[in-house]
Every structure is written in structure tokens, then in C-alpha cells.
């Protein structure tokens, strides 16, 4: 089965204000809130599109400079991650992290 877009993750400065905005402006619902070692996260959905709002506590684990905002990553769901990685690399893409177990951040 082909990979499917699962979510778009945004780095934000004020996670609660941003979640409030997406609720009020687009009718999205908060589906989960999580505090990990390096970031707070709020997951939102309108039933079709999913957003992951990320507010990092510092630069550790974020991959971006402190205070940076914008698209952090796109999350895809697939049935066979090692096979998908090979397909991505064959198409000219690259992985920035090794495959492993999900971390405490909820990913």
C-alpha cells in the first residue's frame, strides 16, 4: 500500500494561542496534548487534515534554531517503513535520522 500523508507539523512560539487560532478560524479539534523532554505538542484535526503543533523548549531535539517557526516536517504513514525508506532513497531522497523506535515525543 502506498504511503499516506498523516500530518503536517508546525513549530510555533505559543502552542495554546496557535491551537486556539486553528479551533476558532478553521473549526479544528484538539485530539491530544503531550509534554515530552524537549517539546510540548498539541495534535489537532478537522477529521480530514491533521496538524501537529510543536513548541520546543530549546534547540535540543528540534533540528531548528531556538524560536524558529514554520513547517517542521510532513508525517507519512506506511505499512512497511524499511521498504518505504528504500523506495525514497531510490527516488533520490534521504533520511536524516536512522529508523528506530518511537521516542518520548510521541513520534
What are these regions (language model features)?
Residues 39, 53, 58-64, 97-98, ...:
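A short, acidic/glycine-rich surface segment
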Residues 20, 52-54, 63, 85-86:
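Short acidic, gly/pro-rich beta-turn/loop elements at beta-sheet edges
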Residues 26-29, 58-60, 77, 94-97:
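Short secondary-structure boundary micro-motifs
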Residues 6, 31, 72, 96-97:
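A short, local hydrophobic-aromatic micro-motif
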Amino acid at each position: 500500500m502506498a504511503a499516506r500523508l498523516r500530518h503536517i507539523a508546525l513549530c510555533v512560539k505559543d502552542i495554546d494561542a496557535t491551537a486556539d487560532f486553528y479551533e476558532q478560524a478553521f473549526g479544528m479539534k484538539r485530539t491530544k496534548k503531550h509534554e515530552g523532554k524537549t517539546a510540548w505538542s498539541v495534535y489537532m484535526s478537522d477529521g480530514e487534515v491533521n496538524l501537529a503543533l510543536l513548541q520546543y523548549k530549546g534547540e535540543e531535539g528540534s533540528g531548528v534554531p531556538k524560536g524558529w517557526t514554520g513547517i517542521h516536517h510532513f508525517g507519512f504513514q506506511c505499512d512497511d517503513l524499511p521498504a518505504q525508506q528504500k523506495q525514497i532513497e531510490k527516488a533520490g531522497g534521504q533520511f536524516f535520522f536512522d529508523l528506530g523506535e518511537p521516542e518520548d515525543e510521541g513520534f
